Swiss-Prot record:
GO biological process assignments: photosynthetic electron transport in photosystem II; response to herbicide
Assembly behavior: PSII is composed of 1 copy each of membrane proteins PsbA, PsbB, PsbC, PsbD, PsbE, PsbF, PsbH, PsbI, PsbJ, PsbK, PsbL, PsbM, PsbT, PsbX, PsbY, PsbZ, Psb30/Ycf12, peripheral proteins PsbO, CyanoQ (PsbQ), PsbU, PsbV and a large number of cofactors. It forms dimeric complexes.
Post-translational modification: Tyr-161 forms a radical intermediate that is referred to as redox-active TyrZ, YZ or Y-Z. C-terminally processed by CtpA; processing is essential to allow assembly of the oxygen-evolving complex and thus photosynthetic growth.
Species name: Picosynechococcus sp. (strain ATCC 27264 / PCC 7002 / PR-6)
Protein name: Photosystem II protein D1 2
Lineage: Bacteria, Bacillati, Cyanobacteriota, Cyanophyceae, Oscillatoriophycideae
Gene that encodes it: psbA2
Origin: domain of life: Bacteria
Subcellular location: Cellular thylakoid membrane
Residue positions binding [CaMn4O5] cluster: D170, E189, H332, E333, D342, A344
């Protein structure tokens, strides 16, 4: 019997590149999604920083009244923002080469589109990269599923909402005060506080914070003692150790007696699934709510829904909220609303004093 040994030919440059891209031995995993993620996020970050510092005022409402958003034009960290592209641009794709000059591109808010489009592509690829690394390591894919919640929220406010409203000028400004302005105007125009999907999102975020604090404090309070009183309890854990670092039975017994037995998980896996799923599902619903309100399927309207025997309105908190909404609405984009028909909040003029008789 003869055995022939043949030396394997050296890998091509492309094969070496592919091996490096998909290698899990790199300090930071790149992956094929990373090939697109890295340049897009770098572009979005670079443009955002430059625009936040030095961009000239933007004609956001399309009425030749520019709004300054950068630091060099008088803003601070809190009031500054990358101002959304002009209402005169609407939903048109507005890259630099579509403008007659760089000055025109800046005046019409071109940097906003550049930032959000590259940012969205980047976070989509980041989510895909999470799946890709999980796949390479033989892990389950739930990390990218959890990250899909903030991705959905960002997509809703930066892409879906402007599409529904017909202009990228309605997108969320890229700044602290701009975010608050977006929230207030959103409430005025869509009554988001009265939308059940927003309520589910609030329950998801606040509930997730509560459950996280409860879980962390329970675990910290039931650690297995491995150190003396003079040492930090953190030294009692060695990375990769096989034994449990806390007593789940003690934690279960404590919480079961504090509330009631079945309020406490006795399965660590189902507990951590719950901790992950609760806020994710809540944020999914909020993103879905914003996406439906983008097309003006708004929150509940209970205005003037309670009348006395004489037909007079008995105000509820819904009516108080409506008055706040009207105040928000009348104060935003003041010069763009020449005929604010949506603020016709005066006394109603009766068009028929009594219903006509129908003989049938």
């Amino acid at each position: 019997m003869t055995t022939t040994l043949q030396q394997r030919g050296s890998a091509s440059l492309w094969e070496k590149f592919c091996q490096w891209i998909t290698s899990t031995e790199n300090r930071i995993y790149v992956g094929w999604f990373g090939v697109l993620m890295i340049p897009t996020l770098l572009t979005a970050t670079t443009c955002f920083i430059i625009a936040f510092i030095a961009a000239p005022p933007v004609d956001i409402d399309g009425i030749r009244e520019p709004v300054a958003g950068s630091l060099l034009y008088g803003n601070n960290i809190v009031s500054g923002a990358v101002v959304p592209s002009s209402n005169a641009i609407g939903l048109h794709f507005y890259p630099i080469w579509e403008a007659a000059s760089l000055d025109e591109w800046l005046y019409n808010g071109g940097p906003y589109q550049l930032v959000i489009f590259h940012f969205l592509i980047g976070v989509f690829c980041y989510m895909g990269r999470e799946w890709e690394l999980s796949y390479r390591l033989g892990m389950r894919p739930w990390i990218c599923v959890a990250f899909s919640a903030p991705v959905a929220a960002a997509t809703a406010v930066f892409l879906i909402y402007p599409i529904g409203q017909g202009s990228f000028s309605d997108g969320m400004p890229l700044g602290i005060s701009g975010t608050f302005n977006f929230m207030i105007v959103f409430q005025a125009e869509h009554n988001i506080l009265m939308h059940p999907f927003h309520m589910l999102g609030v329950a998801g975020v606040f509930g997730g914070s509560l459950f996280s604090a409860m879980h962390g404090s329970l675990v910290t309070s039931s650690l297995v003692r491995e150190t003396t009183e003079t040492e930090s309890q953190n030294y009692g854990y060695k990375f990769g150790q096989e034994e449990e670092t806390y007593n789940i039975v003690a934690a279960h017994g404590y919480f079961g007696r504090l509330i009631f037995q079945y309020a406490s998980f006795n399965n660590s896996r189902s507990l951590h699934f719950f901790l992950g799923a609760w806020p994710v599902v809540g944020i999914w619903f909020t993103a879905l709510g914003v996406s439906t309100m983008a097309f003006n399927l708004n929150g509940f309207n209970f205005n003037q829904s309670i009348l006395d025997s004489q037909g007079r309105v008995i105000n509820t908190w819904a009516d108080i909220l409506n008055r706040a909404n009207l105040g928000f609405e009348v104060m935003h984009e003041r010069n763009a609303h020449n005929f604010p028909l949506d603020l016709a909040a005066g006394e109603q003029a009766p068009v028929a004093l009594q219903a006509p008789a129908i003989n049938g």
